[in-house]
């Protein structure tokens, strides 16, 4: 599954925060079940799967076997790089798309940045930067909002289409896509110190923050352009990812770092309230309620999602 790395990652967080060895044991067991994925080249989500599981495991334990899995995972991800377009292909070609790249793919670049450090192979870093740069050029509208899917030509690298798959419409503001962009470019700034990446993260965040229909509790609707607001489902996974990105940004040397932390704190107050945080033993034992996977696909509507809990 695309999302198989988030639960092991959450277990690593529990071990990190409590020091209780039972969580280390459980995290290791769940992480090591994913080892075979290190050779998977059929989609881009290996970054999600392995960065959240093995990435946290290596960060916390320093186990060299975990480092080796991460390097091999990065090699697998790098096979999807398309030089003419300068991007990592997200999904495989079909009748509709030739080289589709989704904004979610920004979340996979951290695996490449880390692998460059672990291995000394600068090609991982160069691929990550190339992907971030081309995505910045092609995915974003003048107001800072982003498309979900950009389809490129493999032959000459030109853009064929700008679309959405999981949002309300091609020109709508699909909320979780904006969260992926904010988080992904915050990581790019942290790893490269190139200010343009931070500027992009903040431009997209400020666009979301300043939307007139942003709810008072700061938990976005699944798509901020959906037609039936305020009677549209919220997406808690968007809120948790934005908060996580803002906490990251607040640790950086940026103007008004305290303001970004304050906004993240406000999101966390909402997420911790009974409106969104499930009572113990309910909600399938997930922490958070009211996330949305994909309304256009009639999939995971108003349900708990493991990546909402993770972020």
Residue positions per predicted region:
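Glycan-recognition and catalytic cores of secretory/periplasmic carbohydrate-active enzymes
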Residues: 1-311
């Amino acid at each position: 599954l695309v999302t198989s790395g988030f639960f092991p990652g959450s277990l690593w967080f529990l071990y990190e925060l409590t020091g209780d060895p039972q969580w280390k044991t459980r995290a290791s067991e769940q992480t090591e079940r994913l080892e075979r994925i290190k050779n998977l080249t059929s989609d881009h989500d290996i970054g999600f799967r392995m960065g959240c599981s093995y990435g946290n495991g290596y960060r916390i334990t320093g186990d060299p076997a975990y480092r080796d899995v991460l390097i091999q995972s990065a090699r697998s991800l790098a096979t999807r790089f398309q030089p003419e377009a300068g991007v990592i292909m997200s999904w495989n070609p079909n009748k509709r798309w030739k080289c589709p790249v989704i904004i979610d793919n920004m979340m996979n670049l951290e695996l490449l940045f880390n692998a460059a450090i672990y291995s000394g192979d600068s090609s991982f870093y160069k691929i990550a930067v190339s992907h971030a740069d081309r995505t910045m050029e092609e995915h974003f509208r003048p107001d800072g909002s982003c498309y979900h899917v950009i389809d490129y030509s493999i032959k000459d690298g030109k853009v064929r289409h700008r679309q959405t798959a999981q949002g309300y419409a091609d020109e709508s503001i699909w909320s979780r896509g904006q969260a992926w962009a904010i988080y992904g470019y915050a990581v790019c700034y942290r790893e490269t110190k190139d200010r343009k990446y931070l500027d992009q993260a903040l431009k997209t965040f400020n666009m979301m923050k300043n939307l007139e229909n942003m709810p008072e509790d700061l938990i976005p609707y699944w798509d901020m352009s959906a037609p039936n607001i305020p009677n549209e489902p919220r997406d808690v996974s968007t809120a948790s990812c934005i908060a996580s990105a803002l906490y990251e940004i607040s640790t950086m040397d940026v103007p008004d770092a305290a303001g970004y932390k304050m906004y993240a704190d406000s999101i966390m107050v909402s997420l911790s309230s009974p409106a969104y945080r499930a009572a113990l033993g309910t909600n399938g034992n997930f922490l958070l309620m009211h996330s949305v996977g994909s309304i256009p696909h009639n999939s995971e509507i108003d349900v708990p999602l493991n990546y909402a809990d993770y972020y």
